[in-house]
Amino acid sequence: MVARYYHQKSERRRMERTLETLARVQREQRLYPTPTPTPADAYEETRDMFASDRPREALDAIRQAVGQDFKLMELRFADELTKALVSTDGQNVQQFLLARGRKQPEGPAPVNLIGDNPLADSLYEQKAADLDLIPKLAQDAVTRAGIEGGRVTSVSFAYQIVRYKGESPVWTVMVERGTPPDWEHKFVTYDAKGKFKSAF
């Protein structure tokens, strides 16, 4: 449990640094916008990622792009981007990204794996991720986070790095408000069936 606590603290610090960098990049992009051509597969997407069929549609698009059976290491849904880390052979992992308003995912891109644990310990079957839970989890996480004006910005499903034997992958919902330095956030976790685990 001590290892889990320190891991969560380090993950929180890492996420804070990442979001601060993203906020800075977004500010710079607003100051110096660069016109880009409209991709052929682009369309206007107006639905909320966490209250619609967008997660299922995104995973279906990634399935088509992979073109064969695979297991998942991580699924991450955010309003602007869906990320899937997949393994077709149980030995290597590839990343697929699907941007909001696009029909075709980008990928595969190889993922550099670190650590000594067997890859198989971090992979799960596609059916383990019950995407029907996402709207309910998103609503519940906002309530549990208790951040005034907070909203869900990402939902992910993966095994925790530090876990007990036999534990299932975990849903992690990020709730936040504002941008650094005026920024509040919390991670709310649930087991594979949607039972609340923790908020930090």
Give the positions of each predicted feature.
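Exposed beta-strand-loop-beta-strand "reactive/processing" segments of non-cytosolic proteins
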Residues: 61-96, 157-189
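Long, charged/polar, surface-exposed segments that mediate recognition or autoinhibition
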Residues: 107-153
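Short, compositionally biased low-complexity segments
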Residues: 20-39, 99-120
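Extracytoplasmic low-complexity, Pro/Thr/Ser/Ala/Gly-rich segments
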Residues: 12-85, 89
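General structural signal for secondary-structure boundaries
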Residues: 47-52, 126-135, 190-191
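Predominantly extracellular/lumenal beta-strand repeat domains
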Residues: 14, 39-50, 155-163, 169-170, ...
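A short, surface-exposed beta-strand/turn
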Residues: 94-114, 181-200
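Hydrophobic single-pass membrane-insertion segments
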Residues: 2-15
